[in-house]
């Protein structure tokens, strides 16, 4: 439950219309629950189905468009709730244009409480670490013309119970910097420096190549082009790898070419974990328009390379998305056993907003990540992870199917009832890569003892009172192996 305490101060003067920067909306904000409900019913057509986060400006435009269309009272309430949720990221509510000489500032805060029966956030693999904790956060933001900046520290004692958190867990008050960035936004280019979660892939799932499974980390992000065609790139330094011969500096680079034509979106991407003792940022990998695979082969740029592809299509009968990830794959002529490693891959597909009756919609998803995904033959220095958590998804060697109904029956409240089934093997990207002698006997998928987990549950969020928000995921698991 979140109680929002909002106080905004603005220094604005009228000015000529121009490109205006906007704050980004974090992926864990309740605004996305209302946005997803509207997208499933044909709204917010201006945003991508494959790249997040969105800016508050993008989401507000989508909410206003939904309010201008004919909808039931429940669907209209979603648009109103989305607009309300965005107030925490809107520094110029009066609609005036800011400039470097007339910036706008925002200061607001949240108080929240979390009740959980599992410390592990992946509820299909829930543990028994129950807790009830509290916390709070503060946002201080500024928008000045084409520049937007924010800092968002949080105090959250749930961190002490999360097995994925790499920080100290013996503190009376736990905290971290959740979001902190400065972003320059122009007509054909965006530059972002700071930390914020990102997701490339079907929006209802974690991205395979770039997802929000890790805690937010500092990075440089650039985007060049238009909404119809653009190149996005991200670069960051990861945690060091300590090996017997020294300390390896590790870096993560990824870039994605996105093309939108009418209701179709397609994307092609590369990811690279580069490493070395004393290594620094590599200009050939910082170049967003370079092709990593060519530098990897032709210029001897060592690293763990992955390739990805995404597709999304909006139709009158629902929105359909998919993602493919390819890791270790031998493409050169190499008859030796050392070059015949098992394939590393991932695949996901979703269907959202499939008409049922009235405002009710169906959804479905399937995702799979192979047993050797995110692992590297070179060892821990090439591991596709940040502080031990996959840069895309948290777990490998699994597949999961989910089916459910998106129910628009309560105003200002989203409800998704679902059934899910997961198969989880013992393949783990923290383990050493198999030796060449082990290749013939290493399963590519579902290694070792396989855990099977069916789950029935429901997830949703709502505005239950002015300034009070409630989100949750309740369900029952049954484990067998």
Where are these regions (language model features)?
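Signature for the C-terminal beta-barrel architecture of outer-membrane proteins
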Residues: 199, 219-391, 395-403, 408, ...
């Amino acid at each position: 439950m979140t109680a929002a305490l909002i106080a905004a101060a603005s220094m604005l003067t009228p000015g000529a219309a121009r490109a205006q920067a906007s704050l980004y909306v974090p992926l864990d904000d309740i605004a996305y629950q209302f946005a997803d409900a509207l997208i499933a019913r044909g709204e917010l057509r201006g945003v991508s189905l494959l790249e997040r986060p969105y800016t508050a400006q993008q989401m507000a435009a989508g909410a206003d468009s939904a309010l201008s269309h004919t909808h039931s009272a429940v669907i209209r309430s979603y648009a109103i709730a989305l607009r309300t949720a965005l107030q925490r990221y809107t520094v110029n509510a009066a609609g005036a244009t800011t400039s470097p000489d007339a910036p706008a500032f925002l200061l607001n805060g949240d108080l929240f409480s979390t009740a959980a029966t599992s410390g592990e956030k992946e509820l299909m693999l829930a543990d028994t670490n129950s807790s009830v904790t509290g916390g709070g956060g503060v946002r201080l933001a500024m928008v000045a013309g084409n520049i937007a900046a924010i800092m968002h520290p949080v105090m959250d004692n749930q961190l002490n119970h999360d097995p994925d958190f790499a920080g100290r867990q013996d503190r009376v008050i736990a905290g971290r910097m959740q979001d902190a960035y400065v972003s320059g936004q122009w007509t054909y280019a965006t530059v972002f420096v700071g930390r914020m979660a990102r997701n490339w892939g079907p929006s209802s799932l974690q991205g395979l190549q770039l997802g929000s499974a890790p805690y937010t980390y500092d990075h440089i992000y650039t985007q060049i082009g238009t909404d119809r065609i653009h190149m996005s790139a991200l670069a960051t330094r990861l945690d060091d790898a300590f090996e017997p011969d020294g300390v390896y500096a590790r870096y993560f680079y990824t870039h994605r070419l996105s093309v939108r034509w009418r209701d179709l979106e397609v994307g092609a991407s590369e990811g690279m974990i580069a490493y070395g003792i004393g290594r620094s940022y590599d200009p050939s990998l910082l170049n967003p328009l370079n092709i990593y695979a060519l530098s990897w082969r032709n210029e001897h740029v060592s690293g763990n390379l992955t390739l990805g592809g995404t597709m999304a299509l909006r139709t009158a009968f629902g929105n359909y998305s998919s993602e493919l990830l390819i890791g270790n794959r031998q493409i050169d002529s190499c008859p030796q056993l050392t070059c015949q490693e098992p394939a590393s891959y991932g695949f996901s597909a979703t269907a959202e907003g499939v008409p049922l009756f009235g405002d009710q919609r169906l959804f479905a998803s399937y995702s799979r990540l192979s047993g050797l995904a995110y692992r590297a033959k070179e060892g821990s220095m090439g591991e596709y992870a940040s502080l031990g958590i996959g840069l895309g998804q948290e777990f490998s060697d699994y597949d999961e199917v989910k089916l459910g109904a998106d129910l628009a029956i309560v105003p200002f409240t989203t409800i998704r009832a679902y059934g899910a089934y997961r198969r989880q093997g013992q393949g783990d990207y923290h383990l050493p890569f198999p030796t060449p002698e082990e290749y013939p006997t290493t399963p590519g998928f579902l290694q070792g003892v396989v855990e099977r987990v069916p789950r029935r549950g429901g997830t949703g969020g709502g505005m239950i009172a002015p300034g009070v928000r409630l989100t949750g995921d309740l369900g029952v698991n049954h484990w067998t192996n």
